[in-house]
Regions:
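Nucleotide-activated chemistry modules centered on ATP-dependent adenylation/adenylyltransferase
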Residues: 189-193, 213-214, 224-225, 235-244
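Ferredoxin-reductase
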Residues: 2-78
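FNR/FR-type flavoprotein reductase catalytic core
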Residues: 74-209
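Short, Lys/Arg- and Gly-enriched loop/turn segments at beta-strand edges
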Residues: 45-55, 86-98, 231
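Local cysteine-cluster metal-coordination motifs and their immediate loop/turn environment
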Residues: 204-235
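A generic structural signal for residues embedded in beta-strands
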Residues: 40, 81-83, 221
Length: 244
């Protein structure tokens, strides 16, 4: 991870909920991969102390597109201070044919950067928006992504078939109690499958990250054997290894 800067090049208002901010990036960020993120400070002031956590949804040559709430104001031509890339990239199973993405009571934004890669590899994708996530508008997503809506009780139409087709599952949940919500997803899938093998169900953690470099340990995740840091070892963890 390095400290660098990025140029806000273009703002695209997607809908009433979100906007896409296109960033021109320096060579220091050119190796960022899907699953990694950025810690942003918009000016040189130290207030607020904590940086904003930005998730790319599209990674291109010398540019990134990040998804941000529609109500925030950004100015093209402004430079922002960046720490990144933060974390490690997504890891997929071999011979992956169908990916199931779950967003539970939170926006699916952290998961979206994998979609172009999966489509390029002809992997089918189902995105299930659960609970409050069901209000997320998806018209801007590629047509290849199947979008389903479910309840806060993790129910949706044809759930058994959806889970049965999935070779791998990635989930993101509201950060206020990630362990509780990941536990609910774990038990739901456990009721539908004979077993949950390793390298099948992954949770994407979004704790507060004061440093992003593994120095403060504020983003520690408890594992069945030891601990890990979301900023250096995550943000994605195999839930068979997490202490739920």
């Amino acid at each position: 991870m390095r400290q660098t800067k990025a140029l806000i090049q273009r703002i695209r208002h997607i809908n009433t909920q979100i906007q896409h901010v296109e960033l021109g990036i320096e060579e220091d960020l050119s190796d960022i991969k899907p699953g990694q993120s950025l810690l942003i400070r918009q000016d040189e002031a130290w207030h607020p102390y904590l940086r904003e956590h930005w998730w790319p949804v599209l990674i291109g040559s010398q540019k990134l597109i990040v998804e941000r709430p529609a109500g925030l104001k950004y100015e093209p031509g402004n430079f922002i201070n960046v720490l990144g890339p933060v974390g490690t990239f997504f890891r997929f199973r071999r011979n992956l044919r169908h990916m199931l993405l779950l967003a539970y009571d939170t926006l699916p934004t952290p998961l979206l950067s994998m979609i172009p890669m999966l489509i390029a590899n002809q992997t089918s994708i189902t995105l299930v928006l659960l609970g409050t996530a069901s209000s997320y508008k998806t018209e801007h997503l590629p047509a290849q992504v199947e979008v389903l809506h479910g309840t806060g009780d993790l129910e949706w139409d044809n759930r058994v078939m959806t889970v049965g087709l999935a070779d791998q599952v990635f989930a993101v949940v509201r950060p206020d109690d990630e362990i509780l919500r990941f536990s609910k997803i774990w038990h739901m899938l456990g009721d539908l499958r004979a077993e949950i093998p390793s390298n099948y169900l992954f949770g994407m953690f979004q704790p507060v990250q004061p440093c992003g470099a593994g120095a403060c340990h504020a983003c520690m995740v408890r594992l069945t054997q030891g601990t890990a840091l979301s900023c250096t070892d995550g943000p994605t963890f195999d839930l068979t290894q997490v202490k739920l």
